[in-house]
Swiss-Prot record:
NCBIfam families for this protein: PRK15409.1
UniProt entry keywords in alphabetical sequence: Cytoplasm, NAD, NADP, Oxidoreductase
PANTHER family in the cross-refs: 2-HYDROXYACID DEHYDROGENASE-RELATED (PTHR10996), GLYOXYLATE_HYDROXYPYRUVATE REDUCTASE B (PTHR10996:SF283)
Family that this chain belongs to: Belongs to the D-isomer specific 2-hydroxyacid dehydrogenase family. GhrB subfamily.
Protein name: Glyoxylate/hydroxypyruvate reductase B
Catalytic residues in the record: R237, E266, H285
Main location: cytoplasm
Organism: Salmonella paratyphi B (strain ATCC BAA-1250 / SPB7)
Lineage: Bacteria, Pseudomonadati, Pseudomonadota, Gammaproteobacteria, Enterobacterales
Record field: catalytic activity: glycolate + NADP(+) = glyoxylate + NADPH + H(+); (R)-glycerate + NAD(+) = 3-hydroxypyruvate + NADH + H(+); (R)-glycerate + NADP(+) = 3-hydroxypyruvate + NADPH + H(+)
E.C. number(s) listed in UniProt: 1.1.1.79, 1.1.1.81
Assembly, per entry: Homodimer.
GO CC list: cytosol; plasma membrane
GO molecular function: glyoxylate reductase (NADPH) activity; hydroxypyruvate reductase (NADH) activity; hydroxypyruvate reductase (NADPH) activity; NAD binding
Function: Catalyzes the NADPH-dependent reduction of glyoxylate and hydroxypyruvate into glycolate and glycerate, respectively.
Length: 324
């Protein structure tokens, strides 16, 4: 008899068939309490859980006594109570490698769009404001040869540094928990403390996970340390930034512009002042959102769950100690 799993994400047919070859699959729209109650028997017997974005907490785990592995279609997992899973000896699998290049592309796009005011001037053209040869009111600023500061030199940070160093001849500064010798050797990146990075960088790009230490790492003090010409990019997690402090910094001219893929609360409220600022490019958490990469993430998550329920957790496991 095949193990049973709960699937709370719609998958392409080929990936669904791959799951069904190994498991009895119960598909549900979400992990809301009413959904769990409606499918109580399936949740109670499920050994695997696969999906994305929904909260996985102690209350859910109480309804899933047979659960052995959870697989998220994401690199981030701040919506999952990892400690609760580990205490139950449930492994958590994620997809950290397949989205690296795509997210780095998104960060680069935000840098270019904010610096060259692509969204702002495109909207002005659509509004019929381009009636004569443009002047300085339409100008942006250069990207090439400007100093890039990367906060969080992981896989995505490395991919961004590669693009900036080789493609745009940008000096690269970085701040991370530890020195990254490969970044220094390949891209001539310079490690520095956060204050120094903020003071020297023309672009401050944040690519950090959300942890107790990183929550609101960027606030009033940090924005005040940046150049008034600096462009701030966040493609990590929204709550790493105190959004009210960012709004104030933009309104007061403490920084030049911001390109944002993530926000403290998502979806972003239609009343957010960020949406009324011409120097803000706000996109709806599209970091990995290409057809190719999202498919690859789903395929990776499927393979991760198959492997985990066969006891293979050598790669992509968040909490390998749970298997001990």
């Amino acid at each position: 008899m095949k193990p049973s799993i709960i699937l709370y994400k719609t998958l392409p047919d080929d990936l669904l068939h791959r799951l069904e070859a190994h498991f009895t699959v119960t598909q549900v729209p979400n992990l809301h309490p009413e959904t769990v109650a409606r499918h109580a028997q399936a949740f109670a017997s499920a050994q695997g859980l696969l999906g994305t974005s929904e909260t996985v907490n102690r209350a859910l785990l109480e309804k899933m006594p047979a659960l052995r592995a959870a697989s998220t279609i994401s690199v981030g997992y701040d919506n999952v109570e990892v400690d609760a899973l580990t205490a139950r000896k449930i492994v958590l699998m994620h997809t950290p490698t397949v989205l690296t290049e795509t997210v780095a592309d998104t960060v680069m796009a935000l840098m270019l769009a904010t610096a060259r005011r692509v969204v702002d001037v495109a909207e002005r053209v659509k509004a019929g404001e381009w009636t004569e040869s443009i002047g300085p009111a339409w100008f942006g600023v250069d990207v090439h040869h400007k100093t890039l500061g990367i906060v969080g030199m992981g896989r995505i940070g490395m991919a961004l540094a590669q693009r900036a160093h080789f493609g745009f001849t940008m000096p690269v500064l970085y701040h991370a928990r530890r020195r990254h010798q490969e970044a220094e050797d390949r891209f001539n990146a310079r490690y520095c403390d956060l204050d120094t990075l903020l003071q020297e960088a023309d672009f401050v790009c944040v690519i950090l996970p959300l942890t107790t230490e990183t929550r609101h790492l960027f606030g009033t003090t940090q924005f005040a340390r940046m150049k008034s010409s600096a462009i701030f990019i966040n493609a990590g997690r929204g709550p790493v930034v105190d959004e009210n402090a960012l709004i104030a910094a933009l309104q007061n001219g403490e920084i030049y512009a911001a390109g944002l893929d993530v926000f403290e609360h998502e979806p972003l409220s239609v009343d957010s002042p960020l949406l009324n600022m011409s120097n803000v490019v706000a996109v709806p958490h599209i970091g990995s959102a290409t057809h190719e990469t999202r498919y690859n993430m789903m395929a990776c998550a499927v393979d991760n769950l198959i492997d985990a329920l066969q006891g293979k957790i050598e790669k992509n496991c968040v909490n390998p100690q749970a298997a001990g």
